[in-house]
């Protein structure tokens, strides 16, 4: 699999730490992502037979290669014309996962949720564009079951967003909750509040 973003790029001097050292990045270290734990890339790295991370920033690039979490190569480049951002390539370790295949329908659902939860995010998967103009409101409207009794009530704060509505004909209570961009079907403290 290969993932490319066109953001600022992981700071190249911290690239190895960002993809391989637990407790680096995320909470407290980067004010622009205060709610993440920063374990995702590290987990993918350690569960991959091959893992490559490339960061391009300010005309410089760094590419690090790992096998099962062990660094095998570290390449630094200057004078790069490529746009800023990060590229992650990996192959899931078949010794851990056996033969596997990606379930596009699950990725489709996940990516639709992500662009709604992370307003402004745009994702392309196999030439299909994912984008949400209204964030969580789009997610709610796309998943309404029955006729709404009233327009959704939408509350938004610095670190929280809540939408509430009720529908005719629905015999059970349905709560969709997310924390740190992750769907939490079994709830948690945020859902009990």
Where do the protein language model's features map onto the residues?
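Short, exposed beta-strand "edge-strand" segments with a Pro/Gly-rich flavor and a Y/T-containing core
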Residues: 7-10, 67, 100, 125-134
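Generic recognition of stable, solvent-exposed alpha-helical segments in well-folded globular domains
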Residues: 13, 17, 39, 46, ...
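GHKL (Bergerat-fold) ATPase N-terminal catalytic module, capturing the glycine-rich phosphate-binding loop
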Residues: 1-92
């Amino acid at each position: 699999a290969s993932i490319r973003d066109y953001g600022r790029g992981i700071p190249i001097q911290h690239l190895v730490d960002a993809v391989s050292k637990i407790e680096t990045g995320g909470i407290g270290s980067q004010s622009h992502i205060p709610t993440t734990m920063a374990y995702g890339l590290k987990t993918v790295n350690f569960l991959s037979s091959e893992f490559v991370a490339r960061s391009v920033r300010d005309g410089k690039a760094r590419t690090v290669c790992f096998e099962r979490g062990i660094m095998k190569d570290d390449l630094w480049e200057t004078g790069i014309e490529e746009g800023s951002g990060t590229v992650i390539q990996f192959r899931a370790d078949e010794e851990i996962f056996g033969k596997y295949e990606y379930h596009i329908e699950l990725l489709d659902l996940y990516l639709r949720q992500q662009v709604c939860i992370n307003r402004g995010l745009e994702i392309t998967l196999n030439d299909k564009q994912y984008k949400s103009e209204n964030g969580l409101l789009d997610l709610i409207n796309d998943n309404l079951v029955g006729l709404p009794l009233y327009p959704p009530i939408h509350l938004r704060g610095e670190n929280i967003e809540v939408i509430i509505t009720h529908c005719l004909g629905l015999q059970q209570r349905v709560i969709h909750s997310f924390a740190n961009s992750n769907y939490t079907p079994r709830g948690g403290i945020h859902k009990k509040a």
